[in-house]
């Protein structure tokens, strides 16, 4: 029996010896061929290819050969081990992530806010109020208002670390959870400043540090657009040394917001870019909703719900726990940005406050965007100068080229809205018109003529072809296969009023009897009488169109018409809205051959006699009743 066992073992040993000998021969042969393959592959590439490219291609070919060889010989190996599952290829944009939701501990901010004195000036976002100022304090206050166009005196007396009181957002915002998969991207916060007040700039920085999760905030980049104030140089450099996460980059000459933001984006290292102005305060949980939306949709360009910080008292207008009547961005035909209420279809689409608001345009001062997508869609127009028009240009471009522009109501950031800019423009306000022409030429197709009729500076720039080279912007439009402006108006902003592309007459309306023109006056959004003012030929408040319905329209921001009454003529909302509507008699005017403007309802004519234009019995010999409808200069 023992002898039999030895024979069996000897047989098995000889059997597997022959098997492993054959396997060894196969492996030796494989190694020889592999060396020859490597030499052969090396000589196939031209000398112009880089060393890195050759190595990569060699490795790929060798790997293919090795895998094929292994597949051929693996069947000869004893089946002793169950193979590990083969992993599928993962998209490069996806990162490994855990299931579930981020915890509060994971979303802990960069710094904890220091304890606050509830009675301190401006504490909890309350207004700063003082009943009496000394003569010196009054002078300081006036200097600050002149320099910054807000109450810097109040800002300087409010803590840089002030809290904003309880979180007053709606419950669904406070309780909102954020998925770990896909993971929230990191962000670089970019803040451009030019001669900014010390307290507002640093309160913005501290606000970001106290309200942004450390795992998401990669850096704060302060971009100095050639400030001349001493405190914004060595003193600022010294102050931010305490924060390794904050850095400063500087432009040596004033180039404006657009170029400064491009500089900040160029040095940013995070996955997303978040742009803020230098006089902001971030509310609780402001960053996560923005980044979560980008994680869901790579092409989403998202803005926070912008709360107002009072420019006089610095009171923070906190969000309501019951939600609010939100606004979205729009534009008028002078290409100015504005706000409007949400249309009913947008209100119905949103289930609660966590849902984004789709907006035709955005203010452009505060928003987040994927850095790769920012570069993909053409960042900013590098030939736009200083400031103005870049937000409308980006709004049109994002929508027309396949992206989405949204406002996230659960993200709240306060902003000091000034009534005017404290900064001068190195080349004057002409730069704004030039910027607007650049966006109109690229993105508005035939509708650009509506803008040019309303802005004579822009029309001159077009005539002189002084708007610069647009070839790169048109290349972007072609590369991204962007849709036309008709699509934008029909699909994204169907509520927009589109004036006649070819009105019967357009321009200013001048009195023959005196050197004055019809003028709508300041801030006349309807309901106020017209005025008479020195003719300037620049459009704007003196721009009117005579429509096919015989209306005299001033339709730059709203559809407004000359509205006849027994007394002075007013500017009121146009009644005619297209199909199934007609213009009422009060808004119908006839331009007679004798130069009278006749209203058939009252059977009277428009006169320039008096402070306000008014209706009087018609008299063809009265020069004050005669008008010239002329093209703008």
Curated annotation (Swiss-Prot):
One GO BP annotation of this record: gene expression
Composition bias, Basic and acidic residues: 134-145
Ligand binding (Mn(2+)): 277, 279, 415
Segments traversing the membrane: 20-37
Lineage: Eukaryota, Metazoa, Chordata, Craniata, Vertebrata
Encoding gene, per UniProt annotation: Galnt3
Stated name of the protein: Polypeptide N-acetylgalactosaminyltransferase 3
Cytoplasmic membrane side: 1-19
UniProt keyword Manganese, yes or no: yes
Reaction it catalyzes: L-seryl-[protein] + UDP-N-acetyl-alpha-D-galactosamine = a 3-O-[N-acetyl-alpha-D-galactosaminyl]-L-seryl-[protein] + UDP + H(+); L-threonyl-[protein] + UDP-N-acetyl-alpha-D-galactosamine = a 3-O-[N-acetyl-alpha-D-galactosaminyl]-L-threonyl-[protein] + UDP + H(+)
Record's bilayer topology term: Single-pass type II membrane protein
Organism: Mus musculus (Mouse)
Subcellular location: Golgi apparatus, Golgi stack membrane
Positions glycosylated per UniProt: 297, 484
Binding locations of UDP-N-acetyl-alpha-D-galactosamine: 519, 522, 536, 541
Sequence similarity: Belongs to the glycosyltransferase 2 family. GalNAc-T subfamily.
Annotated region (Catalytic subdomain A), positions in chain: 184-293
Disulphide linkage map: 517-535, 561-574, 605-618
Pathway of action: Protein modification; protein glycosylation
GO cellular component: Golgi cisterna membrane; perinuclear region of cytoplasm
Keywords: Disulfide bond, Glycoprotein, Glycosyltransferase, Golgi apparatus, Lectin, Manganese, Membrane, Metal-binding, Signal-anchor, Transferase, Transmembrane, Transmembrane helix
């Amino acid at each position: 029996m023992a002898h039999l066992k030895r024979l069996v073992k000897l047989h098995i040993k000889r059997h597997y010896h022959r098997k492993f000998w054959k396997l060894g021969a196969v492996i030796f042969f494989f190694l020889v061929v592999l060396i020859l393959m490597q030499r052969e592959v090396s000589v196939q590439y031209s000398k112009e290819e880089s060393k890195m490219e050759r190595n990569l291609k060699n490795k790929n070919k060798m790997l293919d050969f090795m895998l094929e060889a292994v597949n051929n010989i693996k069947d000869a190996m004893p089946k002793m081990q169950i193979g590990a599952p083969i992993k599928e290829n993962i998209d490069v944009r996806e990162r490994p992530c855990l299931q579930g939701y981020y915890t509060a501990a994971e979303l802990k901010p960069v710094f904890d806010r220091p304890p606050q004195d509830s009675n301190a000036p401006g504490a909890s976002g309350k207004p700063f109020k003082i009943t009496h100022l000394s003569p010196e304090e009054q002078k300081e206050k006036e200097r600050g208002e002149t320099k910054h166009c807000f109450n810097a005196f109040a800002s300087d007396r409010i803590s840089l670390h002030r809290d904003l009181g309880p979180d007053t957002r709606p419950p669904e915002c406070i309780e909102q959870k954020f998925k770990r998969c896909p993971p929230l991207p990191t962000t670089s916060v970019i803040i451009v400043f030019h001669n900014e007040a010390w307290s507002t700039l640093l309160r913005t920085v501290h606000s970001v540090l106290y309200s942004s999760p450390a795992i998401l905030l990669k850096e704060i980049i302060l971009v100095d657009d050639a400030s001349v104030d001493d405190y914004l140089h060595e003193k600022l450099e010294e102050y931010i040394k305490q924060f390794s996460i904050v850095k400063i980059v500087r432009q040596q000459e004033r180039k404006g917001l657009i170029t400064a933001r491009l500089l900040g984006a160029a040095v940013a290292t995070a996955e997303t870019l978040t742009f803020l102005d230098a006089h902001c305060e971030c509310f609780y949980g402001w960053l996560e909703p923005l980044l979560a939306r980008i994680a869901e949709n790579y092409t989403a360009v998202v803005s926070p719900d912008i709360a107002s910080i009072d420019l006089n008292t610095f009171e923070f207008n906190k969000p309501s726990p019951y939600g609010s009547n939100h606004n979205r961005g729009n534009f008028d035909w002078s290409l100015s940005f504005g706000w409007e209420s949400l249309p009913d279809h947008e209100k119905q689409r949103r289930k609660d406050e966590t849902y984004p608001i789709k907006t035709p345009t955005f203010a452009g001062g505060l928003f987040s965007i994927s850095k790769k997508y920012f570069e993909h869609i053409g960042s900013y127009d590098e030939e736009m100068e200083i400031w103005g028009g870049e937000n409308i240009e980006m709004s049109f471009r994002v929508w027309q080229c396949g992206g989405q522009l949204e406002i996230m109501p659960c993200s709240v950031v306060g902003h000091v809205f000034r009534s005017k800019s404290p900064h001068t423009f190195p080349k004057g306000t002409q730069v704004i018109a030039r910027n607007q022409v650049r966006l109109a030429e690229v993105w508005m197709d035939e509708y650009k003529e509506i803008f040019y009729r309303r802005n004579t500076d822009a029309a001159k720039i077009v005539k002189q072809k002084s708007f610069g080279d647009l070839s790169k912007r048109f290349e972007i439009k072609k590369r991204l296969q962007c849709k036309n402006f008709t699509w934008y108006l029909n699909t994204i902003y169907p509520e927009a009023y589109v004036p006649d592309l070819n009105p019967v007459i357009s321009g200013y309306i001048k009195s023959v009897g005196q050197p004055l023109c019809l003028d709508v006056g300041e801030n006349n959004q309807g309901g106020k009488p017209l005025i008479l003012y020195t003719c300037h030929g620049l459009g704007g408040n003196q721009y009117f169109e005579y429509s096919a319905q015989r209306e005299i329209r001033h339709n730059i921001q709203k559809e407004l018409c000359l509205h006849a009454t027994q007394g002075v003529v007013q500017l009121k909302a146009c009644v005619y809205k297209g199909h199934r509507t007609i213009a009422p008699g009060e808004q119908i005017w006839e331009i007679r051959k004798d130069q009278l403007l006749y209203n058939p309802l009252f059977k009277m004519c428009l006169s320039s006699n008096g402070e306000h234009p008014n209706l009087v019995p018609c008299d063809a010999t009265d020069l004050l009743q005669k008008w010239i409808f002329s093209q703008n200069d």
